[in-house]
């Protein structure tokens, strides 16, 4: 039995163009846990997840109501919202397949540095697209807006996490044979100030935070489940090539060359690199359907020391 941290991608709950209601997300969560049940049952497993669409929806709901919530509060709300979906879905799969482990949703805080350069240059998009006619009103909320191909989106700081506060509770649960569901949306961003823990407006990259948690837990493996089977070099070009098993120094070279796109594969590769550099045995990047095959070395990208 090994210890593994699995970071679920957005497609574990939603697909592009689908309605974002409870029923759709619950249905996808059921399928997710069916697919990964052999991994969770046979290994010490921690599951993390993103919250990009959901935290944007929460912020939009507050925008419509006229009662604005701080961004760190919205991240906390998304952890409860998504945690309920995933926990209920797991318990249904557990009952159907007579699985032995219980799942626990952990409201998780990630400590960041108030002086992180990310606060001076917000870059992480959240929420819906805004038209040229709507953008001025959005800016009146104090939001930083950025023009993308399909319209304007709000962008927020995405600082580097430096500590996962609930790590000891997560460690205890996984050691006792349970499945902690943690670091939702990268964790609630907080800073330590004068003996207090204070929320700060940001959204932390969930893969980077999951990698940090995996290192803190001394996990053997770290797996990022996304919507593609492998990491590619020269992606989208005639000579694009999937990466299979690759050593740390090789993928660091590709990373330095700028082979991986900002906001999509780049943070995933960086998270995997961080984990292996911090003592992990291997990091995997693949799609949901190939998670088990990747662990056996038969699919996906596997980064080793």
Curated annotation (Swiss-Prot):
Reactions catalysed, as given in the entry: hydrogencarbonate + NH4(+) + ATP = carbamoyl phosphate + ADP + H2O + H(+)
GO biological process: arginine deiminase pathway
Pathway info: Metabolic intermediate metabolism; carbamoyl phosphate degradation; CO(2) and NH(3) from carbamoyl phosphate: step 1/1
Single GO MF descriptor: ATP binding
Enzyme Commission (EC) number: 2.7.2.2
Enzyme class: transferase
GO cellular component annotations of the record: cytosol
Domain of life assignment: Archaea
Broad class of the protein's primary localization: cytoplasm
Location in or out of the cell: Cytoplasm
Keywords of this entry: Arginine metabolism, ATP-binding, Cytoplasm, Kinase, Nucleotide-binding, Transferase
PANTHER family: CARBAMATE KINASE (PTHR30409), CARBAMATE KINASE-RELATED (PTHR30409:SF1)
Protein's name according to its UniProt entry: Carbamate kinase
Organism of provenance: Thermoplasma volcanium (strain ATCC 51530 / DSM 4299 / JCM 9571 / NBRC 15438 / GSS1)
């Amino acid at each position: 039995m090994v210890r593994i941290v699995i970071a679920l991608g957005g497609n574990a709950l939603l697909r592009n163009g689908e309605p974002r209601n409870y029923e759709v997300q619950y249905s996808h969560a059921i399928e997710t846990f069916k697919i990964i049940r052999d991994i969770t049952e046979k290994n010490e497993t921690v599951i993390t997840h993103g919250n990009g669409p959901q935290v944007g929806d929460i912020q939009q709901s507050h925008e419509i109501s006229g009662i604005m919530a701080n961004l760190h509060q919205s991240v906390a709300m998304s952890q409860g919202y998504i945690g309920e979906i995933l926990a209920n879905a797991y318990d249904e799969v557990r009952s159907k397949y007579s699985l032995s482990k219980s799942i626990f949703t952990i409201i998780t805080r990630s400590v960041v540095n108030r002086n992180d350069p990310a606060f001076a240059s917000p870059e992480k998009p959240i929420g819906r697209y805004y038209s040229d006619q709507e953008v001025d009103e959005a800016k009146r909320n104090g939001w930083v807006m950025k023009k993308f191909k399909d319209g304007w989106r709000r962008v927020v700081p995405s600082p580097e996490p430096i500590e996962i506060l609930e790590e000891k509770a997560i460690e205890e649960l996984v050691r006792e044979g349970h499945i902690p569901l943690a670091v939702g949306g990268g964790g609630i961003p907080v800073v330590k100030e004068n003996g207090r823990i204070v929320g700060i407006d940001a959204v932390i990259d969930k893969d980077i935070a999951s990698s940090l948690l995996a290192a803190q837990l001394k996990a053997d493996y770290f797996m990022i489940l996304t919507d593609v089977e492998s990491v590619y070099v020269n992606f989208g070009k005639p000579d694009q090539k999937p990466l299979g098993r690759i050593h740390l120094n090789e993928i660091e070279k590709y990373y330095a060359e700028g082979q991986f796109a900002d906001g999509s594969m780049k943070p995933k590769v960086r998270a995997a690199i961080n984990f292996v550099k911090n003592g992990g045995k291997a990091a995997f990047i693949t799609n949901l359907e190939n998670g088990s095959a990747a662990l056996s070395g038969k699919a996906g990208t596997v980064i080793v020391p």
